[in-house]
A protein has these predicted regions:
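A short acidic, Gly/Pro-enriched loop at the edge of an enzyme's catalytic core
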Residues: 149-157
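C-terminal capping/lid region of NAD(P)-dependent oxidoreductase domains
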Residues: 228, 235-242, 250-269
Length: 269
C-alpha cells in the first residue's frame, strides 16, 4: 500500500475498490502519521489490486485484534453507520430503527447503536433475523410480514439504508423530536441510485417535524479512531459472509448483487 498526497494523472479505466487494509510499502514526502511497515486500514483507491494508493487522512492504524481480512471489512460501511447515527443525534436510552439491518452498513449500525446504549430494532428478511439478533438487535422485523412504518410504534431515530419506504410513513413512525437519516438512494442503498427521496427529506424538514435528513458520508481517519476503540473493546466486530481471492473479484461482486449477503464480502490478496 502506498500512501500519497495527490496525483495529476489517473488511468482511463480505474481499478475498483475503496476499503483497504494492508501494510505500508511507501509513503509520500509529506506523510507524518505512518512509516513503511505499519499495518493500516481505511479508504483508498484501486483496492482490487496487489498495491493501492491512499491519502494519509483516510487511513488509521489497524485494530490490534483484527486480521487484515477483518479490518478490510470495516472502513466504508462502519464509518457510514457511525456518521449516520451521529447525524441522527443518537443518545443512550433511545429507540433506534435500522432499516436494512443485515447489510454492511446496517450490521454496523446495529452494533454501534447498541454500544451507545440504544434499544435497537432491525428490519430485514426472515432469513436474516437470527443474524441481526446475533449483532445485538433487541427486536427484529420481517419486512415481508410486519408493517414497520405504520405509526403503531415510534422511534427516536430511524436509519434508513434500504431506501424504499415513503417519507410520509417514516414520519409517522418518529417521535416528535426524533430524526430520520437516509443513507443512500432508492436503489438498494446505493448512494448514487435514486436521489429524489434523499433530496426531498431535508427540504421537508424545513417546514415539518420531526427532523428528516440525508447522509453525505465522508471518509476521514477521525471516524476510524472511535471505531477502533469499539472494536478493540469487543463491542463491534466485522461480519464476513465470504472471502474471495483477487482473481475471483467478479464472483464476489455477483454475490453482493444477489442481495443475499449477511454483512460483508472481502477480497484477499
Amino acid at each position: 500500500m502506498r500512501i500519497m498526497g495527490f496525483g495529476l494523472r489517473s488511468p482511463k479505466n480505474r481499478v475498483p475498490g475503496r476499503a483497504v487494509a494492508g501494510t505500508v510499502v511507501a509513503v509520500g514526502a509529506g506523510v507524518t502519521r505512518f512509516t513503511v511497515g505499519d499495518a493500516v486500514f481505511g479508504a483508498g483507491r484501486g483496492a482490487f489490486a496487489e498495491y493501492a494508493a491512499a491519502r494519509e487522512d483516510r487511513l488509521a492504524h489497524k485494530p490490534s485484534n483484527l486480521t487484515f481480512e477483518q479490518a478490510a471489512a470495516v472502513p466504508i460501511s462502519a464509518t457510514t453507520a457511525l456518521q449516520g447515527l451521529r447525524l441522527g443525534r443518537i443518545e443512550a436510552g433511545q429507540s433506534v430503527l435500522v432499516i436494512g439491518a443485515s447489510g454492511g452498513v446496517g450490521g454496523y449500525a446495529v452494533q454501534i447503536a447498541k454500544a451507545y446504549g440504544a434499544n435497537v430494532t432491525g428490519v430485514c428478511s426472515a432469513a436474516k433475523t437470527d443474524f441481526v439478533r446475533s449483532l445485538g438487535a433487541d427486536r427484529t422485523i420481517d419486512y415481508a410480514v410486519e408493517a414497520f412504518a405504520d405509526g403503531s410504534r415510534r422511534y427516536d431515530l430511524i436509519l434508513d439504508i434500504a431506501g424504499n419506504t415513503a417519507l410520509r410513513r417514516l414520519r409517522r413512525s418518529l417521535e416528535p423530536t426524533g430524526s430520520l437519516v437516509i443513507v443512500g438512494g432508492e436503489s438498494k442503498g446505493n448512494v448514487t441510485g435514486g436521489l429524489g427521496r434523499s433530496l426531498r427529506a431535508p427540504l421537508m424538514s424545513l417546514f415539518v417535524r420531526p427532523r428528516l435528513t440525508m447522509l453525505a458520508s465522508k471518509e476521514h481517519h477521525a471516524d476510524l479512531a472511535p471505531l477502533t476503540e469499539l472494536i478493540e473493546a469487543g463491542k463491534v466486530s466485522p461480519s464476513i459472509e465470504a472471502t474471495y481471492p483477487l482473481d475471483r473479484a467478479a464472483d464476489a461482486m455477483r454475490q453482493l448483487e444477489a442481495g443475499t449477503v449477511r454483512g460483508k464480502v472481502v477480497i484477499t490478496i
